[in-house]
Amino acid sequence: MDRNARIAQAVERRRADILALSRRIHGTPELAFEEVRTSGLLRSLLESESFEVSAASEALPTSFRAVHALGPGGPRVTFTAEMDALPGLGHACGHNIIGTAGAFAAVVLKSVLTDGLPGTIEVLATPAEERGSGKVRLIQDGAFERSDVVLQIHPHMLDTVVCQALGRRTLVVEFFGRKAHAAAAPREGRNALDALVLFYHAAALPRTKLAPGTLFHGVIEAGGEAPNIIPDYARGRFSVRGDAMAKLDRLVDEVRRQANRAAAETGCRVEITEPGPGVTTFRRNRVLEEIFAGLFAERGRPEPAKVREFYGSTDLANVSWIVPTIEPLLKASDSPIHTEDFARDAAGPGGEKALLDGVFILAAAGARLLAEPALLERVRADFRAAPAEEKSPPA
């Protein structure tokens, strides 16, 4: 029996355990940085399978690493396991599938590969992908320094191995004015909400004229307490995105200019902060895409080389600039991510098929990269041969 057949057999043997873990995570969604129960479930699984589990970052208590050394030396294949859910929507991004797939891919791979083969299997539990960019902090703490390749799957509404992500920076824009009675002393006030609304209109309404590949969107989080009191404080949170980091940085500069203009025109003061690290565009690896395309076909998912017109952002993209990384998409639903329908489907038949296929695909790819040094060298060579403008991580 060849290796992939043994991996498929191992996935089938653990089918009930795989689905049960995903359902438990799906049933108790936890927000960014609060993934205590989910982290505990993944940790317990890997400890029970004789992985060595330790903290990955003191700053991120729900993160951890789980390691099994097959033999001395050799490459380290890292599976990332995302855990957090979305406010009000639960697992509408399918992190129950991502976390379960990463953990069980390592378990299956350990059961199939012979100890003594040079190399290490690792799971890195990564919190706060949805809000907080947890992997950026893990990068800063050196969590990926020993990884030779990083593998993760993502459920979606289509199949593709082509990794695309927009760079994103989050801006919190606060305006400070002066309170006054809105009817009795309107000229005594400085309306912070007026400033925020003026800024939002100036920055958002021309969005159809933004440079191709850039986006600006956000929400008003605070805007006053009563209609007869001129608000002295207003706050909005905005995402600025671009398909190239230079475009993103130019748009951020323009957004800042619009905020300062709005403050000047209303007599208010403005403060603009970035509450967390930004995320980058994705550095593709064509050799990893080739490996995964073959495995997609093996699981009955043909033509997985689609390039998307619209796509979002992820902190895994930052990882792709320091180590060869891939995040292929597996169709789990006919609905887009970040919707109630997708949250439902993440624990339905489509989501569970994506999960089982994902465990197989991750484990089979990891097996090849551990057992075929020449293949891993091709992956590294593709990483080193990035176009000149991609030689270093974007600022």
Q: Across the structure, where does each feature detected by a protein language model lie?
A:
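Histidine/acidic-residue-rich, glycine-tolerant segments that coordinate divalent metal ions
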Residues: 62-68, 84-92, 96-97, 103-105, ...
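Acidic/His- and Gly-rich active-site-bordering loop/insert found
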Residues: 3-119
